[in-house]
Curated annotation (Swiss-Prot):
Belongs to the neurotoxin 11 (kappa toxin) family. InterPro entries: Toxin_16 (IPR012499). This is Lambda-hexatoxin-Hv1a. Expressed by the venom gland. Keywords: Calcium-activated potassium channel impairing toxin, Disulfide bond, Ion channel impairing toxin, Knottin, Neurotoxin, Potassium channel impairing toxin, Secreted, Toxin. The record marks I2, V30 as: Important for the neurotoxic activity. Its main location: secreted. Disulfide bonds join C3-C17, C10-C22, C13-C14, C16-C33. It is found in: Secreted.
Length: 36
């Protein structure tokens, strides 16, 4: 599962996917929260 946090801080993005860690920002400026 990948949650994007383009319009908000990564800290606000990650809780929607338990077990994620913040990755990015990518070249498109989006911070992704990836579920391992």
């Amino acid at each position: 599962t990948i949650c994007t946090g383009a319009d908000r801080p990564c800290a606000a993005c990650c809780p929607c996917c338990p077990g994620t860690s913040c990755q990015g920002p990518e070249s498109n400026g989006v911070v992704y929260c990836r579920n391992f």
